[in-house]
Amino acid sequence: MIRVKISNFIKNNINKIRDLGIKLIIAAIIIIIATIILSTNRNHKTNSDNYEKESYKPTETIIQGASVKKEQYEKDNNIINKFLEYCNNKDISKAYELLSMDCKKELYPTIEDFKKYYYETIFDKERTYNLQAWISDKKYTVYKIRYTNNMLSTGLYNEDDVYQDYITLNKKSNKEEIFIGNLVYCEELNIITKTKEIEAIVIKKKVYVSDEEYEIKIKNNTDKIILMDTLQNNKNIRLLTNDKTEYGAYTNSIFMKDLLVEPWQTGTISIKFKKNLSSDKKSKVIQFSNIIKDYITYKENSQNYNDVISIQINVED
């Protein structure tokens, strides 16, 4: 009797039973697939986290030099973290005080300059940072720093809202001070080069992560206006190294008026060259190979003018 009832029930509801079975099978398949995906993602995240932990070694220099000692790194990181906290807390004056004297003088002469050109560009919101030793030698350590928005305070991360800079600390300094804005160090030189027409004094060298800049005084020892270069190309002002490698000047940042020197007068020019800090080539001379001896005559007939001279200015003793 019971078997008959069951048989009749199945016959009367065969379609419903079939649909239910299909739904259960589909549900089981979905659960299995979801479990596999979750497991894979969990393993991937674990592997990724482990890889990042293993690969991120902030004391190992990426470009040049020995790894930074743990004690030195912790000391440097404390100073950099202090700078960041001052900026996040809008304590601009204390952040500015942490800049080295040379950094202030060359890049941010006033606190308003620092506020406008650095602070307001980066710290429009609370930031955190990622630090990596970049270049290290006996005198200094350069760190690459990436400023990102603070996810703990915003809950968001935006790859487009990341700022990169290089921060340098002088190992020989007993002060808590930093170089920012890619500037690594400044060095007084006062090296003199003389010719019959020109006396040149290389006053100072400013070294950046990717460039070298020289401040030069040019004395005109003639009775004509001298033009140090026509700026028609970037091949006539070159930085030469010990192995004769040549680096061109950024002539687009030089004004013609700065290259004009009146008779018996002295002018000052700053010239920057694209020479990386990591290069092991030693800078030797700056070569001016197209100096116009008589600018007035040149202006009158530049096409036929040919009274030019050259000079190699020493940048090392």
What are these regions (language model features)?
Residues 136-217, 260-261, 268-317:
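Exposed beta-sheet edge and beta->alpha loop/turn motif
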Residues 224-233:
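Short, hydrophobic/aromatic beta-strand segments
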Residues 23-37:
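Hydrophobic membrane-insertion alpha-helices, especially the h-region
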